[in-house]
């Protein structure tokens, strides 16, 4: 009775390099965390930030798109709610050591579609490390309000005007905004509507 010859290892077709690469997740330069904050029904006497919740931390392109598509679109938010994307390890609070001496670039919009587009463009720029001063950036906040929505890019060193202006010009280009302004967190702590220190 004839027996089948054993298959030599060299006869087994190797998996193509492209298939192997396609199956591997695409790691980002750093880990990022999505946060959620809903201030629509604040509890009496609750401290600011008490409704802030850490949602998901991710480190691959695939995880980012899955989370964005399923959850983290501003159009899914109710009024007085916020989405945050910050570097892992940094909390979206003035008190965080990385944010304490910082400030934020802000753009406002009265159209929900604009906020959605600017939010996505900013997220892609952050996780894709498109800013030359990426180490100076803490994260971004999308705030949905009844009258006007707001997008804020938080940075570490408010007093360094040269760095902030460079970041501001780049961000303005990314989101295709007419005007954005920068305020210091220290000013915001003292006054509800802090004046703008820089504008582009």
From Swiss-Prot:
Organism ancestry: Eukaryota, Viridiplantae, Streptophyta, Embryophyta, Tracheophyta
The record's account of how the chain is modified after translation: According to the redox status, the Cys-99-Cys-138 disulfide bridge may have a role in regulating protein function by affecting its ability to bind capped mRNA.
Sorted UniProt keywords: Cytoplasm, Disulfide bond, Host-virus interaction, Initiation factor, Nucleus, Plant defense, Protein biosynthesis, RNA-binding, Translation regulation
Disulfide bonds: 99-138
Record PROSITE patterns: IF4E
Result for mutant: residue 165 to V: In eIFiso4E-S
Protein name: Eukaryotic translation initiation factor isoform 4E
Tissue spec: Expressed ubiquitously in seedlings, roots, leaves, sepals, petals, anthers and dehisced pollen, with highest levels in pollen, maturing anthers and roots. Strongly expressed in susceptible plants but not in resistant ones.
Gene3D superfamilies in UniProt: RNA Cap, Translation Initiation Factor Eif4e
Predominant place of localization: cytoplasm
SUPFAM superfamilies: eIF4e-like
Family membership noted in the UniProt record: Belongs to the eukaryotic initiation factor 4E family.
Function in brief: Component of the protein complex eIF4F, which is involved in the recognition of the mRNA cap, ATP-dependent unwinding of 5'-terminal secondary structure and recruitment of mRNA to the ribosome. Recognizes and binds the 7-methylguanosine-containing mRNA cap during an early step in the initiation of protein synthesis and facilitates ribosome binding by inducing the unwinding of the mRNAs secondary structures. Key component of recessive resistance to potyviruses. (Microbial infection) Susceptibility host factor required for viral infection (e.g. potato virus Y (PVY) and pepper mottle virus (PepMoV)) by recruiting viral RNAs to the host ribosomal complex via an interaction with viral genome-linked protein (VPg).
Organism: Nicotiana tabacum (Common tobacco)
GO annotation, cellular component aspect: eukaryotic translation initiation factor 4F complex; nucleus
Keyword Transcription regulation: no
Pfam families in the record: IF4E (PF01652)
Positions of region (Disordered): 1-22
Gene transcribed to yield this protein: eIFiso4E
Biological processes, Gene Ontology terms: defense response; regulation of translation; response to virus; translational initiation
Database matches in InterPro entries: TIF_eIF4e-like (IPR023398), TIF_eIF_4E (IPR001040), TIF_eIF_4E_CS (IPR019770)
């Amino acid at each position: 009775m004839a027996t089948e010859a054993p298959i030599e290892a060299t006869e087994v077709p190797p998996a193509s390099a492209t298939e192997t690469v396609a199956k591997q997740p695409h790691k980002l330069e750093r880990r990022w965390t999505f946060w959620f904050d809903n201030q629509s029904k604040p509890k009496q006497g609750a401290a600011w930030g008490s409704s802030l919740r850490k949602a998901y931390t991710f480190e691959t392109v695939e995880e980012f798109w899955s989370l964005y598509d399923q959850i983290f679109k501003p159009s899914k938010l109710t009024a007085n709610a916020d989405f945050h994307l910050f570097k892992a390890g940094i909390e979206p609070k003035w008190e965080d050591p990385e944010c304490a001496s910082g400030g934020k670039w802000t753009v406002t919009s009265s159209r929900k579609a604009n906020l959605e587009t600017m939010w996505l463009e900013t997220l892609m720029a952050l996780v894709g490390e498109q800013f030359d001063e990426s180490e100076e950036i803490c994260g971004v906040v999308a705030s949905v309000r009844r009258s006007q929505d707001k997008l804020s890019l938080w940075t570490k060193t408010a007093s360094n005007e040269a760095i902030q202006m460079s970041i501001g010009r780049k961000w303005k280009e990314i989101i295709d905004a007419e005007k954005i302004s920068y305020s210091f967190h220290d000013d915001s702590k003292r006054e509800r509507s802090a004046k703008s220190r820089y504008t582009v």
